[in-house]
A protein has these predicted regions:
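Domain-scale signature associated with acetyltransferase and cell-envelope carbohydrate enzymes
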Residues: 1-152, 178-180, 187, 197, ...
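Histidine/lysine/aspartate-rich catalytic loop segments that bind and position anionic ligands
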Residues: 140-162, 167, 172
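Flexible glycine-rich beta->alpha loop in the catalytic core of nucleotide-sugar glycosyltransferases
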Residues: 149, 156, 205-206, 212
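Short coil-to-beta microelement around the adenine-binding A-loop and adjacent beta1/P-loop entry
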Residues: 174-175, 193
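A generic "structured core" feature
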Residues: 182, 196-206, 214
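Conserved hydrophobic/aromatic beta-strand scaffold that supports enzyme active sites
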Residues: 206-208, 216, 224
Length: 244
């Protein structure tokens, strides 16, 4: 009938909407709490693994090494490790995580020199570095390296043109890194390299040859860019009597 009140519109079901909204909030809060607890558990577990997995002089795994000095630590997780019998580490030295230390080509190989790899006192070997010894690598005291440094005393030969390189007999030449030296990130030290005391090696350099005490070297191949002269201080270039 004309003039009668129209049919009232249905009222929204406020109670159901509120309930669903509250459930959503509670669910989001629960997920946040779960992520928070999981995050704490993962990091606490990883820190426990780092503490428990580190190798010190009193660790059971230290018995595999030729020596690990008092106060030294090989951080967890390690890189590849074999030939530990032929590796000696001095006192108060820190070997970072993911560092590979090896002596010989395969585990269990009998070596002709002992130690094959020696790392001195108060050294720090940066994360992800590789020290790959076959004859003799001698790293002095107070040597620090940045991450991802590669040091080896062996290269493959390539003289025989009828043989592929990787099947040719390798050449071993000792490596010496003098006390107090610093090797920047990504340095490669090749067989036969000899660094004097307190040598600074620029990041990314490839080192071969012999370098005197108290110099800065950089480049591919590395060359002396600064040197110290008593009475004159630090000077640019290699100086008189210093090779490039």
């Amino acid at each position: 009938m004309l003039g009668t009140d129209p049919t009232p519109e249905p009222r929204p079901k406020v109670g159901g909407t509120v309930a669903r909204s509250a459930a959503g909030v509670a669910g989001a809060a629960g997920r946040r709490l779960y992520r928070h607890l999981a995050n704490r558990a993962v990091h606490a577990g990883w820190e426990w693994l780092e503490r428990s997995g580190a190798i010190g002089p009193d660790s059971p795994r230290a018995r595999r090494f030729g020596a690990i000095g008092r106060g030294s630590c090989l951080a967890f997780p390690p890189g590849a490790q074999f030939g530990e019998r032929w590796i000696r580490i001095g006192e108060d030295t820190l070997v970072g995580p993911y560092v590979s230390l090896s002596a010989g080509m395969v585990p269990g190989q009998q070596m002709v020199t002992d130690p094959v790899v020696r790392i001195g006192d108060r050294c720090m070997i940066g994360r992800g570095s590789h020290i790959v010894g076959h004859f003799n690598i001698d790293i002095g005291d107070d040597v620090h390296t940045g991450p991802y440094v590669y040091i080896t005393d062996q290269n493959h030969g390539y003289e025989d043109q009828d043989e592929v390189v990787h099947t040719q007999w390798p050449h071993d030449v000792p490596v010496v890194i003098g006390d107090g030296s610093w090797l920047g990130t990504g340095v490669v030290v090749l067989p036969g390299a000899v660094l004097g005391r307190n040598v600074v090696v620029g990041a990314g350099s490839v080192v071969r040859g012999t370098f005197p005490d108290h110099c800065v070297i950089a480049g591919v191949p590395a060359r002396i860019v600064r040197h110290y002269e008593p009475g004159a201080g630090w000077l640019a270039g290699p100086g008189v009597g210093h090779g490039a």
